[in-house]
Swiss-Prot record:
<dbReference type="GO" id="GO:0003735">
    <property type="term" value="F:structural constituent of ribosome"/>
</dbReference>
<keyword id="KW-0687">Ribonucleoprotein</keyword>
<feature type="region of interest" description="Disordered">
    <location>
        <begin position="1"/>
        <end position="26"/>
    </location>
</feature>
<dbReference type="GO" id="GO:0015934">
    <property type="term" value="C:large ribosomal subunit"/>
</dbReference>
<protein>
    <recommendedName>
        <fullName>Large ribosomal subunit protein bL32</fullName>
    </recommendedName>
</protein>
<dbReference type="Pfam" id="PF01783">
    <property type="entry name" value="Ribosomal_L32p"/>
</dbReference>
<feature type="compositionally biased region" description="Basic residues">
    <location>
        <begin position="7"/>
        <end position="16"/>
    </location>
</feature>
<dbReference type="InterPro" id="IPR002677">
    <property type="entry name" value="Ribosomal_bL32"/>
</dbReference>
<keyword id="KW-0689">Ribosomal protein</keyword>
<dbReference type="GO" id="GO:0006412">
    <property type="term" value="P:translation"/>
</dbReference>
<comment type="similarity">
    <text>Belongs to the bacterial ribosomal protein bL32 family.</text>
</comment>
<dbReference type="InterPro" id="IPR044957">
    <property type="entry name" value="Ribosomal_bL32_bact"/>
</dbReference>
<dbReference type="InterPro" id="IPR011332">
    <property type="entry name" value="Ribosomal_zn-bd"/>
</dbReference>
């Protein structure tokens, strides 16, 4: 089993963990239907960037 050779300080531990925070979901309003959707994702109606890409 791997064992560290020298103890890492609280500062180094904190610096390593500084990138682990979660961010909120980025939402956009669809131009055609006006509904909220995730950025860079198709809406529930099948629109992406103002164009119909999925036919139901």
């Amino acid at each position: 089993m791997a064992v560290q050779q020298n103890k890492k300080s609280r500062s180094k531990r904190g610096m390593r963990r500084s990138h682990d925070a979660l961010s909120t979901a980025q939402l956009s309003v669809d131009a055609t239907s006006g509904e909220l959707h995730l950025r860079h994702n198709v809406t529930a109606d099948g629109f992406y960037r103002g164009k119909k890409v999925i036919n139901k």
